[in-house]
Amino acid sequence: MQDIRNIAIIAHVDHGKTTLVDKMLLAGNLFRENQQAGDLILDNNELERERGITILSKNVSINYKGTKINVIDTPGHSDFGGEVERVLNMADGCILLVDAFEGPMPQTRFVLQKALEIGLKPVVVVNKVDKPNCRPEEVYEMVFDLMFSLNATEDQLDFPVVYGSAENGWMSPDYKKETGDITYLLDTIIETIPAPKQLEGTAQMLITSLDYSTYTGRIAVGRIHRGTLKSGQNITIVHRNGSMEKTKIKELHTFEGMGHRATEEVCSGDICAVVGLTNFEIGDTICDFETPEALPTISIDEPTMSMLFTINNSPFFGKEGKFCTSRHIGDRLNKELEKNLALRVEMKDGSTDQWIVSGRGVLHLSVLIETMRREGYELQVGQPQVIYKEINGVKCEPVEELTINVPEEFSSKMIDLVTRRKGEMLSMEAQGG
């Protein structure tokens, strides 16, 4: 039975999360000496590299001193919140990565709050301590205050801190003492983060993410909650609505380094990919063939805004892209639905070539539009609209909740700014000082 640790990495945009994972992969001797490692290994999607953001959550695993560390890279942007919550369910602990100059930022707070609510044990990494004007000790205090304000438990507040520079490839318990590698961080992970609990019994696995392969179609990814799954085993899928379906696993894959490796059997606590299932959604449970028991499903954030997608009917039709017809665009949007969770697509009433596409926010939809454009699709998009809902016969509009933390002297300016946009102040409190 292999020793396993499942960790999620939480960080603000540009604090060096993907660089840190690169260095962890190198420490796990993932690349042969003559192999070109490259940087930003995880952000392998062109758009992610250009914008410097992680859009899709990814899984990699590192073997270190006989322990398998499954690293789950989470998107830091709240537009991809649908990705974050599902992914945290697979982890037993998290690495909170903060910049030694900037400290914890609003997006860090968003993901950290979700992680603490689930009960993950944090390890704090203060990165970029080699930069001038950095203030590692103050940042440590800020992280502690942030966790305290997010109602962390005593055990969570007793977190280890690692200082270092992912760019230069070192981590150490003291930011003044530079070491030659990042093994201190890997040792801290193995000591601090609990191993997954081994639960005996019939198999249960919650599908928390999707992978897609052009050869085998959709692949279900998740963490085995209880029991073991075997290749070729007959199973039952319990859908979110409670309906059941009998089917069979064609292949089981575990994550090894950057890729998958086929295996015969996976035990509870490990993260695996199941190949050969056809009809499944995120939030479904894979369980025993004869005695299916479903796990509680995951809630996914509802879309907040929509845009109209339609074919290009301007005089420049067909000049830029090669897929211009409504059939092409319709097929592409339906394909996107298979792996993009927080997205909704519906035909506009009475139309055959107009779709209303709803998503989490402007960034979420702009990434989809840009991806489609690069793939050679040609389309027109309308202005973003907020989504109205009818609840008990009353038309309701979405309301954003805004929390602002500022020094006292700026508070009047903030109130002025928000009230101009028809904001309504619910509470104001002074903290500290």
Predicted regions span which residues?
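P-loop NTPase switch module centered on the Walker A-proximal segment
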Residues: 1-98, 102-104, 138, 142, ...
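Residue-level signature of catalytic and energy-coupling elements of molecular machines
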Residues: 14, 20, 52, 71-73, ...
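Active-site phosphate-binding and catalytic loops of NTP-dependent enzymes
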Residues: 30-57, 80, 146-159, 190-203, ...
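Amphipathic helical hotspot of TIR/SEFIR-family domains
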Residues: 103-119, 140-143
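Canonical P-loop GTPase G-domain recognition
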Residues: 121, 131-191
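Accessory interaction regions appended to the cores of large information-processing enzymes
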Residues: 140, 160, 184-191, 220-433
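Accessory interdomain/linker segments of ATP-dependent helicases and helicase-like nucleic-acid enzymes
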Residues: 167, 182-221, 225-229
